[in-house]
Amino acid sequence: MKVAVLGAAGGIGQALALLLKNQLPSGSELSLYDIAPVTPGVAVDLSHIPTAVKIKGFSGEDATPALEGADVVLISAGVARKPGMDRSDLFNVNAGIVKNLVQQIAKTCPKACVGIITNPVNTTVAIAAEVLKKAGVYDKNKLFGVTTLDIIRSNTFVAELKGKLPTEVEVPVIGGHSGVTILPLLSQIPGVSFTEQEAADLTKRIQNAGTEVVEAKAGGGSATLSMGQAAARFGLSLVRALQGETGVVECAYVEGDGQYARFFSQPLLLGKNGVEERKSIGTLSAFEQRSLEGMLDTLKKDITLGEEFVTK
């Protein structure tokens, strides 16, 4: 199994690469790519960790050597948020970066599963889909927006609030991956209940958690370490499913049946070909139903922005 990380010299990329070097199954290959010249050195640094995962690093304009034979590609390349910016302010720079990298994926490893971490995810996933479609290689079961950070944050905050072990809480999060489009289904956590006010406050905290980190880092970056952990969790789940493990479920932002929007984050059963089944979002509380209806315009606008970036 070969995993490629694009944007591997950045804060998320390095954290992700470290976790994958330690946790990928024995015999896996890990290839790191970034435009930054330090990237081969990051790979050498990680190569000294004693795990049976082969690692190589590549830098420069051309990601092709890193992509050859990749089964899974995780894209974290792009610029990070600064205080006062929201995820959509990143669009102007990151849209072009994602488009360029996905064009190279379409040529070099068109059958790979691709996980997009680069923000704004609501939009960059739509860009990736249109690029792959243009190249004639789009498979909607193999393109994912990685929203796992919303899930792990939800798990942490719920556990704190309710005095649970964080490892015992699993919160499904649906919708998208910014602001109001992030909707944790707090009503679906077994053995935990919330007043409507608690649910509203907690939902807001989960939606704004990224901004909390950006502000706390005081201009020094955005969420890199928790995002690296989230991306590793998603990437490792995907690898396990691709290798034939059954019952692997993760939430991610994918093209579905279009019931709510063309792309929508929901629980997915993963399998040997990527998405095996898009699972139902289940029964929502009145608050969740209102939140879902209230986000759809924003989500659809984000998606259209990405589609038009490629098609216009």
From Swiss-Prot:
Disulfide bridge positions per record: none
Domain of life: Bacteria
Active-site residues from the entry: 177 (proton acceptor)
One protein family per Pfam: Ldh_1_N
Keyword Oxidoreductase on entry: yes
Enzyme class: oxidoreductase
Keyword annotations from UniProtKB, A to Z: NAD, Oxidoreductase, Tricarboxylic acid cycle
UniProt binding sites for substrate: 81, 87, 119, 153
InterPro entries registered for this protein in UniProt: L-lactate/malate_DH, Lactate/malate_DH_C, Lactate/malate_DH_N, Lactate_DH/Glyco_Ohase_4_C, Malate_DH_AS, Malate_DH_type1, Malate_DH_type1_bac, NAD(P)-bd_dom_sf
Catalytic reaction equation(s): (S)-malate + NAD(+) = oxaloacetate + NADH + H(+)
Function: Catalyzes the reversible oxidation of malate to oxaloacetate.
Name of the featured protein: Malate dehydrogenase
Species classification: Bacteria, Pseudomonadati, Pseudomonadota, Gammaproteobacteria, Enterobacterales
Gene: mdh
